[in-house]
A protein has these predicted regions:
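Conserved ABC transporter NBD signature motif
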Residues: 56-67, 71-72
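Conserved ABC ATPase "signature" region
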Residues: 96, 100, 107-125
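Conserved ABC ATPase signature
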Residues: 129-136
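Conserved catalytic motifs of ABC-family nucleotide-binding domains
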Residues: 150
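Catalytic Walker B motif of ABC-type/P-loop ATPase nucleotide-binding domains
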Residues: 154-158
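ABC transporter nucleotide-binding domain
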Residues: 172-266
Length: 309
């Protein structure tokens, strides 16, 4: 388990992480969310032992990161922001070097290097210098070194930032494969909200170094003003006044062309049956009628901009 208790970090007068506390249990894939400058990377650096906190504590698999640093780090694989590697080294040589640092040798070293290479699909670039690789392959090399020793805990800081859509999909698929059927802990620090819906079982949102929200993606989406909203796709514009007068409706949003209406429900209200009935009574030509689970970006924006949710 990862346990973070009242973790605090200051840089001069600036409080980067402010009394932050949360736990991560085995088997969880945690999305660690926040806008740029929220304190995500600073928290990751403290959690992995690369930055000393000014207050509070953190432990990994029962080992205190300040007093039992090496024991804690042996349990972790860490992909720092930007996936820094030795650019003049070739991929295979770099991974063998990391294996040596991790205490692997002989046949075990070769076996673990081969496993990591296959998992992240690096076979075609083993002989290339890292500095010649695309950003996507550099990120894969960073992932390979992080999983080389088959760690119990995987810490990934902005693993898909700057990648194209295909590269993002590949990295997310790898994260899912690493987490599936295992008791590992995966922590993904990101400001990309689609990452959470794609791979995470739980999300923590921070802002200005403070904890703002903690829950599953479904739980967070349920806090959105779009939770239980009904969206209509119409063949022709329709008058929304009748929708606005329905019981349980708080507002109606219209697209610029008037062909899409989003009917917002009051908290705790289910309005789908009434909206569908009204559309039939008004004889609207409805191409699609759907209920929203909620929008994570709406919750994120409201929390991090200081609005109540």
């Amino acid at each position: 388990m990862i346990s973070i208790n009242s973790l605090t970090k200051r840089f001069g007068d600036h409080v980067a992480v402010d009394n932050l506390s949360f736990d991560v249990k085995p088997g969880e894939v945690l999305g660690f969310l926040g806008p740029n400058g929220a304190g995500k990377s600073t928290t990751m650096k403290m959690l992995t032992g690369f930055l000393t906190p000014d207050g509070g504590s953190a432990s990994v698999c029962g080992f205190d990161i300040q007093t039992q640093t090496l024991l804690a780090q042996q349990k972790m694989g860490y992909l720092p922001e930007g996936a820094p590697c030795y650019g003049d080294m070739r991929v295979k040589g770099f991974l063998e070097f990391i294996a040596n640092v991790r205490g692997l040798s002989g046949a075990e070293r070769q076996r673990q290097v081969q496993r990591a290479v296959e998992q992240v699909e690096l076979q075609d670039v083993l002989g290339q210098r890292i500095e010649t690789l695309s950003k996507g392959f550099k990120r894969r090399v960073g992932l390979a070194q992080a999983i080389l020793h088959d760690p119990q805990v995987l810490i990934l800081d902005e693993p898909t930032d700057g990648l194209d859509p295909n590269q993002k999909h590949q990295v997310r698929r790898l994260i899912q494969q690493l987490a599936e059927g295992s008791n590992k802990i995966v922590v993904i620090s990101t400001h990309i909200l689609e990452e959470v819906s794609a791979v995470c079982s739980r999300a923590v949102i921070i802002g200005k170094g403070r904890l703002l929200a903690d829950g599953t993606p479904d739980e967070l989406e349920a806090r959105s003003r779009y939770h239980q909203a009904v969206t209509l796709s119409l063949a022709a514009p329709a008058d929304s006044a009748a929708l606005e007068s329905l019981p349980g409706v708080v507002a109606v949003e219209r697209s610029a062309d008037g062909l899409a209406l989003t009917v917002l429900a009051k908290p705790g209200e289910v309005i789908f049956p009434a909206v569908g009935q009204l559309a039939r009574e008004q004889q609207w030509q409805v191409n699609e009628l759907s209920v929203e689970r909620g929008r994570l970006d709406d919750v994120f924006r409201s929390l991090t901009s200081g609005e109540a949710v």
